[in-house]
Design a protein with these regions (language model features):
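Periplasmic N-terminal accessory/gating domains of Gram-negative outer-membrane beta-barrel systems
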Residues: 81, 86-99, 110-213, 217-222, ...
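C-terminal beta-signal and adjacent terminal beta-strands/loops
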Residues: 845-892, 905-910, 916-1009
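Short loop/turn motifs that connect adjacent beta-strands in outer-membrane beta-barrel proteins
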Residues: 213-215, 230-235, 272-275, 348, ...
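Periplasm-facing N-terminal accessory domains of Gram-negative outer-membrane beta-barrel systems
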Residues: 19-115, 120, 182
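Gram-negative outer-membrane beta-barrel transporters
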Residues: 604, 726-733, 744-865
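Transmembrane beta-barrel wall of Gram-negative outer-membrane proteins
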Residues: 257-364, 384-406, 600
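Signature of Gram-negative outer-membrane beta-barrel scaffolds
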Residues: 324, 465, 469-472, 496-653, ...
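Membrane-embedded beta-barrel scaffold of Gram-negative outer-membrane proteins
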Residues: 407, 411, 655-657, 661, ...
Length: 1009
C-alpha cells in the first residue's frame, strides 16, 4: 500500500503539464529621472495585491506570479516623488516590461500618475503569441470563442472547423484558466464544443505553434482563455441582445429573424480584504440555430407515388413548403456560467477556484436543409440531444520568497451527452413498441407491426419523408470524465535567468453506449408478436447475440449491454487513457537577448484493446465472438520533445525572434476505441473482417500519436508610437498523420510478411505547411484604431483527413495510396481580417457624438482547393435525387479531370458591423448597440459542385440521362427547388452548405454598474 501511495505521489508531481500556469511576470528598471542612476531598493508594488519587489543594485526588479489583468503599478523611494502607472496589462505566461523614472522630491512635489499604453511590440516573447483582451472583445460584432480566435493570422475556419498553420482539424488545445477544456475523445474542433461566456473573458491568448516546453497536448496551437477576477469594488453588468423582431421566416429591416435571444449577467467584487469573486451566467436561445440561405417554395399538390407501400395518389400530410431563410424544428437552448474565486490566505499563499458549467439541448434531424426537408412531417416528436459540460480547478500559489514560487493544481472535467426519444428517455426498449405509443395517446393506425412504425411517405419517384407518429430507432449516450493534478515550480535565479520545472498527470474515464437498430432488437428479444420472449442459456450468450450487428447493433463500453448499469472493469469496462508529462525550462532575459530552452517529456497510454494474435485471434467459434480473456492492451508511447526559442530585442522598437520545436498529439480516441468487444470481434474475425474497409470495418488499436516539427522566424517592429507590425515566417513538417490503410502481417505467423490482414488506422500520411503572417496595428489616433491580419500560406500533404484514403482501401485494383503531396482541402492561400474601430470618448464630439462608436470587421479569403470531376454517366446506386452529387458522395465513382485539388473556390469577402452609443448616467453606464453580421447579405460561396465548378448547378438536369425523369410530373421543379436552389443533394453528400450565412441584425442593451 505504501509503495502504491508513493507511486501515485510521484505521478502527480512528475508527469504532464496539460494544465498551464496562467500567471504573468512584471519586470523593469527604476532610475533617477535626471541622472539615470539606478535607485537601489526602490519599492515596487502591484496595487490591489500583496505582490511587489525591491530594485537591485542595477535598479532592476522582477515581480512573479501576477494573475492576468490590468493593474496600477506603484513605485516609491525615499527622497523621490512616488510614481503610479495605471492600465498596465499583465498577460498569462508572458513578461510585461515597465520601467520607472523617478524625480527628486526637491524638484517635483506632487506624486506623478501616468496611464500606460499597451505596448505594440512584445519584447519578451520568443514565439508568436496573439493576444485578444476584454477591451478588444467588447466592441466586436461577433460572438464565440472560436470565431474570435479565427480572426488571427495563421488560422483557417472552414465549414465550422478551425485549422491553425496547416494542421488538421482537432490539433488545437483549449485551456480555461489553465484547466484543459479539450476532450481527447473528440479533439474538439468545432465551435459548439468549446464555449465561454464572452463577457467573462479577461484575455484570449493564441500560440499558433512554437510554444515552449511547459505547453503540450497539441500539434498546431494553444488557446488559453483567462477568466476575469473580481475587483476591489462591486461591479455588475447586464447585457441582452436579440434579433427576434419578426415571426419565423419573416423579415425585419429586410433581414430574416433567426429568433436569437441572448442574456448575460456578471457580478464581481470583494468580500472583505482577502476574498474576491467573479460570476457570469448566460442564457441563449435560437429559434433557427443554423443560419442559412433558404429560397422559399411551396408544393401543395404532391401525392404519394406508392413506392414505399402506401396508397398511390394519396395526399401527403401537408404542403411541402419552406419559408425564406428558415429551417423548422431547428431551435437550440443553451445555458452556461463561469466563475472565479480568489482567496489570499496570506501575503505568501493564494488560492484560486475556477468553475464552468454548460447545459445545451436541441432537437436532432433539423440542423440543415436536407434534414429539415426529410423530417418535415415528423417535427412533432424529434429525437433530442442534451449535452452537459463542466470543469473545475483549484490552484494554490505559494510565494516562498520574492523570487521563487510554486503552484499546485487539481482539476476535474466532465462531459455527458445523450440522444434520446423525448417521451421515453433512457428506456430505449419502448422506442419502437406500438403498445407504448398507444398508452401515450398517439395515433398508431398506420403502424405496420407491433415493432414496426408507419411507412415513409414517398413522392415523385421515391423522394421520401419520415412519417408522423413514427418510432425513433436509435439511442446513444457517452460520458468522459478526467481527474488531473499538476505542480509547477518557478524561480527567478537572478535578474536574468528564470527556471521552471513541472509536471502533470491526467486520468480519464470514458464510457459509450449506442443502439443502432432498436426494432430489430425488440423482434429478436420478444418475437414479431411482442409476446415470444427469447430465452438465453446464460448472460454471456445474451450479451454476445444482442450486440450482434444483425440484431441490435449495440456498441458499448463502460455500460452493460442493456445500457442500464455501469461496468467498471473488464474488457467491456470504461476506457482509462492516461496522459502524463514533465518539463524543464530555462528562460534567459537580457536587454538584447532572450533565450528560452526547454525539454518536454510526454507519455500517452491509450490502453486500447487488441487481440494478442492479429492473424488468428482467439475466437469463440460458436458465436464468432472474440475470446475476451485473450485480449491485451496497447503499450504506452513516450516522447522527448526539445524546444528552443530566442528573441533579439535590437532596440526598444525592434525585436527579432526564432523558434524550433517538436510536438506530438494523440488522434481523437472516439475513432480509436470504436465500440468495445462486439465491434472488435466484427473487425478482426477471420470470417467477417474486410480488406477493403466495407461497412465501416477497421481497427483503431494500430493508431499512434501524430508528430509535428515546426520552425519559425519573425520580426516585431514599432514604426511610430502608435503604429507597429509583426511579420512571421513558419514551416511545419507534418509526420505520422493518420489514414485508412491495410494492416500487414509481420511474417512471424502463418502469413507471409506484407500480407494484408484487415484495415485500420495507420500513421502513414505526411505533409508540409509553410506560410508568411503579417499583423499591422494602429493604436487609437484621433478616434481611429485599426488592426490588419494577413496570412499567405500553402498546406500540402498526402491526405486532408484520416479518411482521405478510403477509396484506395476500398478498391486497390483501381486506386493507389498517394505518394506525392498536394494542396489539401482546407488550404487557403490568402486569408485575412481588417478591424477598424472609430469612436468618440466622453466629452468628445458634443452631447450627441460623445460615446458613439463604430466597429467594422472585414474578413476575406481566396477560397480553398477542390478537384473537378466528371458528371455521372449513370445512376449507379444513386437515387433520382442524389445523382447530381453521386461522385461527391461515393468516391468510388469519382473520375477526376485534373490532378488532385488543382482548382479553387472563389474569393470570399464578409463585413460585420457594430454601432453603439454609451450614456453616462448618475450611477451606471447604459449602452445601446446593434450588431450586423454579413452586412451586405452576400452569398459567399464556400463550397462548389465539383462536377460543374459552380454553386447553383450540379449539371444533372442538363444531362441526357435526366430526360426520363424530367418527364415525371413536378420532377424538374422539385429538383430545382430542393437541390439547385437549396442544396439538398450537396448536404446529403458532404454534410456542408455551399453558401455562408445570410445577414443577421441584432439589437442590444448593456448596463454596467
Amino acid at each position: 500500500m505504501l509503495r502504491k501511495a508513493l507511486l501515485a505521489v510521484c505521478a502527480v508531481f512528475l508527469l504532464p503539464a496539460l494544465l498551464i500556469a496562467q500567471d504573468g511576470k512584471l519586470r523593469g528598471r527604476v532610475t533617477d529621472k535626471e541622472s539615470g542612476d539606478p535607485l537601489v531598493g526602490a519599492n515596487v508594488t502591484v496595487d490591489g495585491t500583496s505582490l511587489g519587489a525591491a530594485a537591485d543594485l542595477r535598479g532592476d526588479y522582477v515581480v512573479l506570479g501576477i494573475p492576468p489583468g490590468v493593474y496600477t503599478i506603484k513605485v516609491s523611494y525615499i527622497g523621490y516623488q512616488p510614481v503610479s502607472i495605471s492600465n498596465v496589462r499583465v498577460n498569462a505566461g508572458l513578461t510585461t516590461t515597465q520601467d520607472f523614472k523617478l524625480a527628486s522630491s526637491a524638484i517635483e512635489v506632487t506624486a506623478l500618475e501616468v496611464v500606460a499604453e499597451r505596448p505594440l511590440v512584445q519584447r519578451n516573447t520568443t514565439n508568436t503569441v496573439r493576444l485578444t483582451t476584454t477591451e478588444d472583445i467588447e466592441n466586436l460584432p461577433i460572438r464565440g470563442l472560436q470565431n474570435i480566435v479565427a480572426l488571427n493570422a495563421g488560422t483557417v475556419q472552414q465549414n465550422g472547423t478551425l485549422y491553425i498553420r496547416g494542421g488538421r482539424s482537432g490539433e488545437v488545445a483549449y485551456f480555461v484558466d489553465g484547466i484543459t477544456a479539450s476532450n481527447p475523445m473528440f479533439n474538439d474542433s468545432r465551435s459548439e464544443n468549446i464555449s465561454v461566456v464572452q463577457e467573462a473573458i479577461e484575455e484570449i491568448q493564441l500560440q499558433a505553434g512554437g510554444f515552449t516546453a511547459e505547453h503540450g497536448g497539441a500539434n498546431s496551437g494553444i488557446v488559453k482563455t483567462t477568466l476575469k477576477t473580481g475587483g476591489s469594488a462591486l461591479r455588475v453588468t447586464v447585457d441582452y441582445r436579440t434579433d427576434d423582431f419578426a415571426k419565423a421566416g419573416e423579415e425585419f429591416l429586410g433581414t430574416t429573424s433567426q429568433g436569437f435571444r441572448n442574456a448575460v449577467l456578471t457580478v464581481g467584487g470583494p468580500v472583505g480584504s482577502k476574498f474576491r469573486y467573479f460570476l457570469s451566467g448566460q442564457h441563449n436561445y435560437m429559434r433557427n440555430r443554423t443560419a442559412a440561405f433558404v429560397d422559399q417554395f411551396n408544393f401543395t399538390t404532391l401525392t404519394d407515388d406508392g413506392l414505399t407501400g402506401r396508397t398511390v395518389g394519396a395526399s401527403l400530410p401537408d404542403a411541402v413548403a419552406f419559408k425564406k431563410n428558415f429551417l423548422p424544428g431547428n431551435q437550440r437552448y443553451d445555458n452556461q456560467g463561469q466563475g472565479t474565486f480568489v482567496y489570499n490566505l496570506s501575503n505568501a499563499i493564494k488560492f484560486r477556484l475556477t468553475g464552468s458549467y454548460q447545459h445545451q439541448k436541441f432537437p436532432l434531424g433539423f440542423a440543415d436543409f436536407r434534414q429539415a426537408l426529410n423530417n418535415l412531417f415528423s417535427g412533432d416528436r424529434p429525437q433530442h440531444l442534451v449535452t452537459k459540460r463542466g470543469l473545475g480547478g483549484l490552484k494554490m500559489t505559494h510565494l516562498i520568497n520574492p523570487n521563487t514560487f510554486y503552484e499546485v493544481n487539481v482539476n476535474y472535467t466532465a462531459r455527458d451527452s445523450r440522444t434520446f426519444d423525448p417521451d421515453f428517455g433512457d428506456d430505449w426498449l419502448k422506442y419502437s413498441d406500438r403498445r407504448e405509443f398507444e398508452k401515450l395517446g398517439y395515433d398508431v393506425s398506420e403502424w405496420q407491426k407491433i415493432f414496426e412504425g408507419p411507412l415513409n411517405y414517398s413522392t415523385i419517384f421515391k423522394f421520401q419523408f419520415t412519417p408522423r407518429n413514427g418510432p425513433i430507432n436509435t439511442y446513444s449516450k457517452d460520458s468522459q470524465q478526467s481527474l488531473g493534478a499538476a505542480v509547477d515550480f518557478t524561480s527567478q535565479v537572478n535578474k536574468n535567468i528564470e527556471m521552471k520545472i513541472g509536471g502533470r498527470f491526467d486520468r480519464w474515464t470514458m464510457r459509450a453506449y449506442s443502439v443502432g437498430d432498436i426494432d430489430n432488437a425488440l423482434v429478436y428479444l420478444y418475437g414479431s408478436d411482442g409476446n415470444t420472449i427469447r430465452n438465453f442459456p446464460d448472460d454471456y450468450v445474451r450479451r454476445v447475440e444482442l450486440a450482434s450487428g444483425a440484431v441490435g447493433g449495440i456498441n458499448y463500453y463502460g455500460w452493460d449491454v442493456d445500457g442500464i448499469n455501469k461496468v467498471n472493469s473488464g474488457p467491456n469496462g470504461p476506457q482509462h487513457p492516461l496522459f502524463g508529462s514533465a518539463y524543464v525550462q530555462s528562460k534567459w532575459e537580457y536587454r538584447d537577448l532572450i533565450l528560452n530552452v526547454g525539454l518536454r517529456y510526454e507519455r500517452i497510454d491509450a490502453k486500447v484493446l487488441r487481440p494478442a494474435n492479429l492473424e488468428d485471434p482467439a475466437f469463440d467459434k460458436s458465436n464468432d465472438f472474440i475470446q475476451e480473456d485473450q485480449l491485451i492492451r496497447t503499450d504506452p508511447y513516450n516522447y522527448l520533445l526539445p524546444r528552443l526559442n530566442f528573441a533579439f530585442p535590437v532596440t526598444a522598437n525592434t525585436v527579432f525572434y526564432a523558434q524550433y520545436g517538436k510536438y506530438i498529439q494523440m488522434p481523437n480516441l472516439n475513432d480509436i476505441y470504436r465500440g468495445g468487444t462486439r465491434r472488435l470481434s466484427v473487425d478482426v474475425s477471420t470470417i467477417t473482417r474486410s480488406l477493403y474497409g466495407f461497412f465501416n470495418q477497421y481497427v483503431g488499436f494500430t493508431a499512434k500519436p501524430e508528430r509535428t516539427d515546426q520552425y519559425e522566424l519573425g520580426i516585431r517592429q514599432s514604426l511610430t508610437d502608435n503604429f507597429a507590425f509583426t511579420v512571421t515566417a513558419f514551416y511545419k513538417d507534418l509526420k505520422d498523420q493518420l489514414r485508412f490503410d491495410r494492416v500487414l502481417a509481420d511474417g512471424t505467423g502463418r502469413l507471409a510478411a506484407g500480407t494484408p490482414i484487415f484495415v485500420g488506422w495507420i500513421n502513414n500520411d505526411f505533409g508540409t505547411a509553410k506560410g508568411l503572417e503579417m499583423t499591422l496595428e494602429l493604436r487609437r489616433v484621433k478616434r481611429l484604431a485599426a488592426r490588419l491580419n494577413y496570412t499567405l500560406s500553402n498546406t500540402r500533404g498526402t491526405g486532408s483527413d484520416s479518411r482521405s484514403t478510403r477509396v484506395a482501401v476500398s478498391d486497390a485494383t483501381i486506386s493507389s495510396y498517394p505518394t506525392l503531396i498536394y494542396n489539401l482541402d482546407y488550404n487557403q492561400a490568402h486569408r485575412g481580417t481588417a478591424m477598424l474601430d472609430y469612436r468618440f470618448n466622453q466629452g468628445d464630439g458634443g452631447s450627441i457624438l460623445q460615446g458613439l462608436g463604430l466597429n467594422a470587421l472585414l474578413t476575406f479569403n481566396s477560397g480553398h482547393n477542390y478537384t473537378k470531376i466528371l458528371e455521372p454517366s449513370n445512376l449507379g446506386q444513386a437515387s433520382a435525387w442524389t445523382v447530381g452529387t453521386r461522385a461527391t458522395q461515393d468516391p468510388r465513382t469519382r473520375n477526376p479531370v485534373e490532378p488532385i485539388n488543382s482548382s479553387t473556390t472563389p474569393w470570399n469577402f464578409n463585413v460585420d458591423l457594430t454601432l453603439d452609443k454609451v450614456f453616462k448616467l448618475s450611477s451606471f453606464d447604459l449602452k445601446l448597440y446593434a450588431n450586423v453580421l454579413n452586412a451586405f447579405n452576400t452569398r459567399n460561396i464556400i463550397n462548389l459542385y465539383e462536377t460543374t465548378g459552380t454553386a447553383n448547378d450540379d449539371g444533372w438536369l442538363k444531362s441526357p440521362l435526366a430526360a426520363q425523369y424530367i418527364e415525371l410530373a413536378n420532377y424538374r421543379d422539385f429538383y430545382q427547388a430542393i437541390n439547385l436552389d437549396n442544396r439538398w443533394g450537396y448536404y446529403t453528400a458532404t454534410g456542408n452548405d455551399v453558401y455562408g450565412a445570410p445577414r443577421q441584425i441584432r439589437f442590444g442593451v448593456s448596463i454596467e454598474y
